């Protein structure tokens, strides 16, 4: 569900409606517009009923510490159930987060302090995702998994296999992607989609 760029009452209604229908996993990030500011108030009174995941694009220990506390404050929560390195894409990303005083040092400290329960990452590079799982015992990987990428482009099977071998939880993003947007396609109905979504079964 989308809660950014809408007024608080609409965001809260969407969240409550989702919870009423059994949805209990919510994923947000500072880069998602004002989603943190909208989701925080919407979860008041029901925070203990949901699994709340957040992300950071910061790559240094200090940067993560600062952004983590900002996100906790915006979301009005004492902890995140899952905190993730956001958009791990390049070799430089990998080197930055794993070096001394890199992001992972902050993640480990935050887990020890009870500010986060699980440590994960999101990635759009199969190579980087697999390397990361070899370098650290992550709890989860958030990765594009859909019929088009997986079966037509062979993008994903290696990540899934590595995650299974390492005991890393798999979370799918872009699961409803059908194809890339055609040149000049009308995107007005799906302004926030980076791809043509599946609209029916």
Identify the meaning behind each predicted range.
Residues 1-10, 53-63, 91-96, 187-199:
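Active-site mouth loops of central-metabolism enzymes
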Residues 1-50:
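N-terminal binding-site loop/beta-alpha segment at the start of enzyme catalytic domains
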Residues 5-18, 61-76, 124-133, 201:
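Short, acidic/polar
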Residues 18, 26, 39, 52, ...:
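Conserved, mostly hydrophobic/aromatic
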Residues 19-20, 39-48, 69-78, 132-136, ...:
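Acidic (Asp/Glu)-rich catalytic clusters
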Residues 23, 77-80, 116, 138:
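A structural motif
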Residues 72-95:
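Active-site groove signature of glycoside hydrolases
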Residues 88-201:
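Beta/alpha (TIM)-barrel catalytic core signal, keyed to glycine-rich beta->alpha loops juxtaposed to Asp/Glu
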